[in-house]
């Protein structure tokens, strides 16, 4: 018997969406359609990442904190509160730690479970949240085997590839 895929209500950028899609039924949420989608599809859990844009750019500027927009994450908070009332687990993944911890920590504080890509940020979440969430843990980036399959070795010209970001003089 084939195992049923989990249904994930998702607020994420494209990279994460594509990574999860082969293993889950994805329900992309926007600030405009989340009410009817959550009522109709009853997901297994809500997964929100530290997205800069989200599905079709609908979350741009609505998850990260900005000084000139103090209430920009109100819609996200409403979604999390709805999910908690309906007993839907809520998960936040900050893939921008440690550099953007402050930018996403307010939104992260709404959730039951918080994941970070930086083990050193766990204590920061624990002290910030005063143990309001159920757990804080590490969730590293991964490769989706469906998209990144090993291929037979062929003779290649080797070069250099850099995957990362430039943060100037922050350290």
Where are these regions (language model features)?
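Nucleotide-sugar donor phosphate/pyrophosphate-binding loop at the beta->alpha transition
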Residues: 91-105, 141-147
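Structural motif
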Residues: 44-45, 89, 113
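Conserved nucleotide-sugar donor-binding subdomain of glycosyltransferases
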Residues: 18, 68-69, 73-77, 87-100
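Structural recognition of the beta-strand scaffold that forms the well-ordered cores
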Residues: 47, 91-92, 161
């Amino acid at each position: 018997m084939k195992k049923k895929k989990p249904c994930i209500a998702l607020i994420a950028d494209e990279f994460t969406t594509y990574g999860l899609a082969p293993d889950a039924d994805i329900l992309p949420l926007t600030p405009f359609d989340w009410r009817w989608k959550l009522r109709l599809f009853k997901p297994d859990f809500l997964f929100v990442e530290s997205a800069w844009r989200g599905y079709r750019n609908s979350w741009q500027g609505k998850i990260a904190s900005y000084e000139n927009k103090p209430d920009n994450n109100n819609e996200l908070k409403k979604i999390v509160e709805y999910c908690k009332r309906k007993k839907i687990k809520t998960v936040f993944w900050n893939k921008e730690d440690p550099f953007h911890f402050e930018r996403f920590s307010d939104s992260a504080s709404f959730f039951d479970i918080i994941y970070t890509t930086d083990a050193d940020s766990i204590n920061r979440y624990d002290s910030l949240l005063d143990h309001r969430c159920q757990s804080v843990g590490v969730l590293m980036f991964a490769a989706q085997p469906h998209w990144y399959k090993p291929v037979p070795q062929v003779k290649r010209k080797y070069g250099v590839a850099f995957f990362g970001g430039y943060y100037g003089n922050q350290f």
